[in-house]
């Protein structure tokens, strides 16, 4: 009976890892879009680049990476100089990452 519980929990964990990897890939793509957009202020593009590097660091736990990026992006989403389209993308990223953190 204990073996069944262990197998079931490992399947759940593997599914969670795949889901977080898919989410990180989607978020990374959005961040690259922000980084390449010249209408976005340089400080926001730098924050997007830093966030992308953190997301792609396999040495950290996925929840730690998600929480760190949420913190960075939450700060820049309140920047008065961020264009509306970039703010909307940041909010989309925050929404995606909140699902991993929980």
UniProtKB/Swiss-Prot annotation:
Entries under HAMAP family matching the protein: UPF0147
One Pfam family from the record: UPF0147
Family: Belongs to the UPF0147 family.
Source species, domain of life: Archaea
Phylogenetic lineage: Archaea, Methanobacteriati, Methanobacteriota, Methanomada group, Methanobacteria
Protein name in the entry: UPF0147 protein MTH_1407
């Amino acid at each position: 009976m204990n073996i069944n519980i262990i197998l079931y929990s490992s399947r759940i964990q593997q599914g969670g890892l795949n889901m977080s990897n898919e989410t990180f890939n989607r978020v990374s793509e959005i961040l690259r879009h922000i980084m390449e957009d010249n209408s976005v202020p340089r400080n926001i593009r730098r924050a997007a680049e830093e966030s992308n590097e953190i997301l792609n660091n396999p040495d950290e736990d996925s929840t730690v990476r998600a929480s760190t990026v949420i913190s960075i992006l939450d700060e820049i989403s309140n920047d008065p100089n961020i264009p509306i389209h970039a703010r909307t993308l940041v909010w989309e990223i925050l929404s995606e990452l909140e699902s991993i953190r929980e």
